Regions:
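Short, Lys/Arg-rich, polar N-terminal cytosolic tail immediately upstream
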Residues: 1-19
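Short cytosolic juxtamembrane segments of multi-pass membrane proteins
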Residues: 3, 288-297, 498, 541-553
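Membrane-interfacial, low-structure loops and terminal tails that flank and connect transmembrane helices
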Residues: 8-9, 13-14, 194-199, 291-297
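Short, membrane-interfacial amphipathic segments enriched in basic
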Residues: 50-57, 329-339
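Juxtamembrane helix-boundary/capping and inter-helix hinge elements in multi-pass membrane proteins
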Residues: 95-98, 179-188, 199-202, 241-243, ...
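Short helix-to-coil transition segments within interhelical loops
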Residues: 182-213, 449-470
Length: 553
């Protein structure tokens, strides 16, 4: 009897074996990841079970001011991104151009936060382009003004960077929902009914489409708020310094040789987590109503063009900054151009290869694990595991990094490639899951029934039918995981134990040193590497074209 014989395929024994094999694969996948994540959480909990870290935290004179700066910058940036996303999505939906704009988001997503922070610094610094373009004819300045336009006390520069970076992310999450056939048809039908009842396009979107879309985007909003409250590298580049944000303060305490200060830093991270839960609970209930009112207003239709123009200007600033030589104020362009900083980068190519290696390995590990889990795990297992998988996205990275560092010490993976790859994969997992999960689960199960009825083995169906049809989503998830890996700062510092240098750690270090050319070059590399990977993903994810004579086997 042949391997693909239909009677054998339909036998209860074979079905039972295949079901048990799938559960075994899911069990292995779950057992590989869940203990590591839970152990990391436990390692981060242990230091704060005593009262002394909390007492030290509240007695520190910088805590309250740092907490105030954190709440102001994070909430302001999150609400700005949320309202802007609502406006842009309304504009794209009403104009029938959602696919046109949303498909162009990958270059914006590929720009790391640190690179955007450096680009904004090059624009708004006292010696930046903004003052050069307006001096002296408008401002009257013949020399840079003595103003703290970056790292200002109010954190306005930090708010601007976080707003610009989180806006494309929220739009991309919405795109994953708008591109689902079932949702798109239903929402367009309901929108058309609202129009026939005399509603304006703005009112129809605000009252019919947006409330449903917003409910699906509340977890991504929590992720945005969590990142904004706990970001370290961006705050080091452009955030306030007197006081710094609480995340930066906690990072400084965790780096100290004093164990008591380490525990104080962990307590600060848990304080951020508690505040995140409280603020998220309020936003969960109120933000949809607030923005529904906002989306019901008339507005100028230049939002998407403005967003892409801002990113183009950011990339231009990085490019010019990386090749600029002597540049006296208020000249708009440098006196001469040079490539010395790029030559110094080429002398340190190890940082580039380390970044590429970590990104490739961690993205591949992430994708393999997710596919195995989504394909083999029962639905009730996935429902239980999903909050754990999304936890790295919504909990402070400082907690994860501290916990993973303790796990790495226990497993002797500190400063080693396996520990680095696993740490980067853990941080990339939730973003890749968001990109892949809905599309993977929405695949047409009738195709599997047809394949099995033709006597094909389930693995043949996966290799020849399902995965090729999903290759765009699979490559996109892999590219997103790669981009997340490139942007990692804290895991590289802690798990790498200072032995791994990436373009991100170099960009942050050079920005602290005030090296305009070097920080621009590394920030540009931060952007170019994910862009190249997204381009590869687009090319590899193109649909196949068959001729009449081609068949699948």
């Amino acid at each position: 009897m042949g391997w693909f014989d239909r009677e054998r395929m339909d036998s209860p024994l074979r079905a039972m074996i295949e079901r048990k094999a799938s559960i075994a694969v899911a069990s292995v996948a779950g057992c590989l990841l869940a203990p590591a994540l839970l152990a990391a959480i436990w390692m981060a909990v242990k230091p704060v079970l005593q009262s002394s870290p909390w007492a030290d935290l509240w007695q520190d004179p910088r805590t309250f001011d740092a907490l105030t700066a954190t709440l102001w910058t994070s909430i302001a940036a999150s609400l700005l991104a949320w309202c802007s996303a609502a406006y842009l999505l309304r504009q794209a939906f009403i104009g029938g151009q959602s696919g046109r704009w949303l498909n162009r988001l990958p270059p914006l997503l590929a720009t790391p936060h640190a690179a955007m922070a450096i680009a904004v610094t090059l624009w708004i610094a006292p010696t930046g382009w903004l003052f050069r373009l307006s001096s002296p004819w408008l401002t009257g300045f013949d020399s840079p003004p003595p103003w703290a336009t970056t790292q200002d006390t109010w954190g306005l520069g930090l708010i601007l960077v976080l707003w610009l970076k989180e806006l494309p992310f929220l739009c991309w999450v919405a795109a994953t929902q708008l591109h689902r056939d079932d949702v798109r048809r239903r929402w367009h039908a309901e929108y058309a009914v609202a129009l026939t009842m005399g509603r304006s396009p703005q009112s129809a979107f605000a009252e019919v489409v947006w409330p449903q879309l917003a409910r699906l985007m509340r977890w991504p909003l929590v992720a945005v708020l969590a990142y904004n409250m706990t970001v370290v590298d961006v705050a080091l580049i452009i955030g306030p310094t007197a006081p710094p944000t609480l995340a930066v303060l906690a990072w400084e305490w965790l780096r100290d040789a004093d164990l008591a200060l380490n525990h104080q830093g962990v307590a600060a991270a848990w304080l951020l987590a508690a505040l995140l839960i409280a603020i998220s609970a309020v936003l969960w209930v109120t933000v949809t109503r607030v923005v529904t009112s906002f989306t019901n207003r008339q507005a100028i239709g230049l939002g998407w063009v403005t967003l892409f123009l801002v990113y183009a200007l950011a990339w231009l600033a990085l490019l010019v900054g990386s090749v600029s030589g002597l540049w006296p104020f208020p000249d708009v362009w440098p006196d001469h151009w040079q490539a010395n900083d790029w030559l110094r980068v080429t002398d340190n190519l190890d940082s580039v290869w380390t970044t590429v290696g970590l990104g490739t390995l961690s993205a591949t590990l992430t994708l393999l694990w997710l596919v195995a889990w989504l394909e083999c795990a029962p639905q009730n297992w996935q429902a239980v595991m999903r909050p754990i998988l999304l936890a790295p996205m919504v909990l402070p990275p400082l907690l994860w990094v501290f916990g993973l560092y303790q796990v790495a010490l226990w497993g002797h993976w500190e400063g080693a490639w396996p520990g680095m790859v696993v740490a980067h994969a853990v941080m990339a997992m939730p973003y890749a899951l968001l990109a892949l999960e809905s599309v993977y689960k929405a695949s047409d199960r009738r195709l599997q029934s047809v394949a099995l009825s033709l006597g094909r083995h389930p693995m043949t169906y996966l290799l020849v039918v399902k995965w090729p049809l999903l290759k765009r989503a699979l490559w996109s998830a892999w590219a997103i995981a790669f981009a997340v890996s490139v942007a990692q700062f804290l895991p590289t510092l802690y798990i790498g134990a200072g032995r791994f240098v990436t373009v991100t750690t170099e960009a942050v270090a050079q920005s602290a040193a005030g090296q305009r050319g070097l920080m621009s070059a590394y920030a540009l590399l931060q952007t170019v590497l994910p862009l190249l990977v997204f381009a590869i993903a687009v090319m590899m994810g193109r649909p196949r074209h068959f001729t009449k004579d081609q068949t699948w086997t």
